[in-house]
Amino acid sequence: MPRDALSFELQLSAGLEATEHKLDMLTRLLRRTHVAVKHPLLASRAFHTSPALRAIDMAKVDTTERLAELRKLMKERKVDVYTYISGFTGSAGYAVVTHDKAALATDGRYFNQAEKQLDSNWELLKQGIQDVPTIQEWTADQVEGGKVVGVDPSVVTGADARKLAEKIKKKGGEYKAVDDNLVDLVWAAERPARPSEKVIVQPMEYSGKSFDEKVEDLRKELEKKKSLGFVVSMLDEVAWLFNLRGNDIPYNPVFFSYAVITPTVVTLYVDESKLPKEVKDHLGDKVAIRPYEAIFGDITALSKDAFEAADADATKKFLTSNRASWALNKALGGDDKVEEIRSPIGDAKAVKNEVELEGMRQCHIRDGAAISEYFAWLEDQLLNKKATLDEVDGADKLEAIRKKHDKFMGLSFDTISSTGPNGAVIHYKPEKGACSIIDPNAIYLCDSGAQYHDGTTDTTRTLHFTKPTDMEKKAYTLVLKGNIALERVKFPKGTTGFALDSIARQFLWAEGLDYRHGTGHGVGSFLNVHEGPIGIGTRVQYSEVSLAVGNVISDEPGYYEDGKFGIRIENMIMVKEVETNHKFGDKPYLGFEHVTLTPHCRNLVDMTLLTEDEKKFINDYHKEVFEKTSKFFENDKLTMDWLKRETAPY
């Protein structure tokens, strides 16, 4: 590693890696080695809440001493650019520090949160805002004059590495892979053991397709591509392909693993102690089991053998996902021997079969009943019993209610239980001892979801228990109109989520309002609650993948006023073929089927803003909600009365 000028770029999942133990060990290493580090927070919503995260609130973190120590050490080490701990706890961010600057980049979901948490030492780069540089541009601007930016290749994609390398090269710098991961050196022998939770089988009654069929389908894709094989690196893709589920990653039923599929061999890389007898019986002798740690050595040898064989075809390559790490690409021999593509497994996984679709329908009935029971309880506690409840109390109660329902396996993300101004923090996470008391006179936003053996849920409802302001009612109704419009749209086959995004925003736009997040994300079947490659929004990737029959996706427009309130309404919708009077271009036309079954808040609806057609749509929806969920409340008068009131016709 060159000593003249180095920045070390480290990317890890906040959900996987941000633990109290790691932060403590990082601090010890800083004192010991005079080095400071910060990882960009990339990831997804976490499955279980770590003690460290529970200790974090939304207050500013004074980083003056940290930065002073870091800059002193940077001068000693002749380091010009480094990443560092900023005090920001959002799940998507990137911090970079130079001798005289410190910047953190994040997207619109976290502008509010970052402004609350970052102290005056930091420049906030609001990604996506006009004239604000990307973090890559900002980083490249700091390395003029031959400086070196180092990266652990196992935590960046090949595409991201190439893009940043090009930017740095144009500035006269160098971007290179560094073998050692600083966090791994920090932990050393004190690093916590990798989770050893047992893997379970996702049976045919829920998966609807055998893993043999899925492997055969993948091999057909490999044949079309004339490929030597496919390295599976996304955990949810491994789980889906083999009809297995795990519990290694908070809220996501996956397990640490890789897989390699060639035309003749299927190999699963996993700690074999995690596989009980029923899993081994399920896999049989069709799948070779290799240690998780063997993946890089094995694929290096596999590639070498393939390209050095006497009958080797120089035109054939190995395939990896375009979301796979740069390290996988390098282990297979680099760009000349690897083609990075949108994963065919990801594409197949996003198209649910009839068994999976029916599972989504059924789990949302149970989940909708749980949410209604919670809202009825919460209203009674706040208005009738005058109880004092904080946001965590609410989230815990909702989880307890969900646990009573059949096939419940856990939450699908941390419940966003937010009152008043906290609702404006789009990915708000309440912490016991640092959260707010639920105010019955303020808007309450609840975004929550669960994992069931037959499906995954994600529902957001916004409530007001007393008298909302005119602006709150107007904003809520505009969001509701957008939610309905998106669900009701019909579109030709081949349409992307990028093309549909404005349908949900149109009523807000007409008033000069908007929201800084996507309108929809794909959802797994007892898998990750955020699932690609589909989505509805302005991300470039959403313009590259057409929506297809069998996709399950969220419909979640919103509106937020910093320091005041947040509004979001989220339903799960499934793509289906629909009838139209004409079929221009002889194309099938598609539409959506909702599966979420939770009432909208009557108290927040401004009836004067709804058309008669929209009122009928809501009435029909509420009738369905009552018919499908009221059976759970035959002996629960409180919830039954609440449900009857909330689903009564307008």
UniProtKB/Swiss-Prot annotation:
Q: Which GO terms describe its molecular function?
A: metal ion binding; metalloaminopeptidase activity
Q: List UniProt keywords, sorted A-Z.
A: Aminopeptidase, Hydrolase, Manganese, Metal-binding, Metalloprotease, Protease
| Entry GO terms, CC | cytoplasm
Q: Tell me the cofactor note.
A: Binds 2 manganese ions per subunit.
Kindly list the positions annotated as binding Mn(2+) 1: 458, 556, 570
Look up the record and name the cofactor or cofactors this protein needs.
Answer: Mn(2+)
The record lists the catalysed reaction(s) as: Release of any N-terminal amino acid, including proline, that is linked to proline, even from a dipeptide or tripeptide
- Pfam families under this entry? Creatinase_N, Creatinase_N_2, Peptidase_M24, Peptidase_M24_C
Q: Summarize where Mn(2+) 2 binds, as residue positions.
A: 447, 458, 570
Q: What is its EC number?
A: 3.4.11.9
Q: State what this protein does.
A: Catalyzes the removal of a penultimate prolyl residue from the N-termini of peptides.
Similarity comment:
Belongs to the peptidase M24B family.
Q: What is this protein called?
A: Probable Xaa-Pro aminopeptidase P
